[in-house]
A protein has these predicted regions:
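N-terminal leader/targeting and accessory segments in enzymes
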Residues: 1-100
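Phosphate-binding loop of NTP-binding sites
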Residues: 97-204
Length: 204
């Protein structure tokens, strides 16, 4: 008889199906985490300036995260001990995979909407607004994601980011799709490109 494999030895998709309830969110911010959600923990930035939310894995577990996906590279001994919890699942190169994982979790919303990315040094906000308004006038229910917030044009909610991080972006795209949008005009900052925030997003 074969010994039972530990949960984190199973393929990621099976782990999520087994441990996470439908409707749960994925987030990299413990402040937004609700019991049952999935936490994504990975460092972002470079040697000069780096934000590492793996420091909040214990907080995520105490808040009732169903699963914590974490980047195993460079993990301190203290965090390695915390990650012995069966809910913690290592994912190599998570910063670049987070968007793809979250997109799959939310039903790949960008595959069934027209998503237009706007990048550049200046003018992203204005251009994204104009594009969304023009599509709206062509009877294509449109939304925008950017500096002013995210949502359908008549209900834009602040997010605090020009381009939200990968899990939040996929969550927003899923919500916008469920609200009836068929098109999205999205600001794409240089930081977003550098940090892989739009990975998993199909751009037209």
């Amino acid at each position: 008889m074969n010994a039972m494999l530990p949960v984190n030895a199973l393929p990621l998709e099976i782990i999520l199906q087994k441990l996470v309830k439908a409707g749960a969110n994925m987030t990299s911010d413990t402040r937004a985490l609700q019991a049952g959600d999935v936490m994504m923990a990975y460092p972002v930035g470079n040697q000069r300036q780096c934000t590492d939310n793996r420091l909040f894995i214990a907080d995520a577990l105490s808040k009732g995260a169903s699963v914590v996906l974490y980047e195993p590279a460079g993990l301190s001994a203290e965090l390695q001990a915390i990650c012995l919890d069966q809910r913690c699942v290592p994912v190599k190169d998570l910063a670049n995979q987070a968007g793809v994982i979250a997109s799959h979790w939310y039903g790949e919303p960008s595959q069934t909407m027209r998503v237009i990315g706007v990048t550049g040094t200046n003018g992203k906000t204005s251009v994204a607004q104009w594009v969304a308004q023009a599509l709206n006038q062509k009877n294509q229910p449109s939304a925008m994601i950017g500096t002013l917030g995210a949502g359908l044009l008549d209900h834009v909610v602040p997010t605090g980011f020009t381009t939200p991080d990968a899990p939040q972006l996929q969550s927003l795209l899923g919500r916008i799709k469920n609200q009836g949008a068929t098109s999205v005009a999205m600001e794409v900052s240089s930081h977003a490109l550098d940090q892989g925030r739009i990975h998993g997003t199909h751009l037209d």
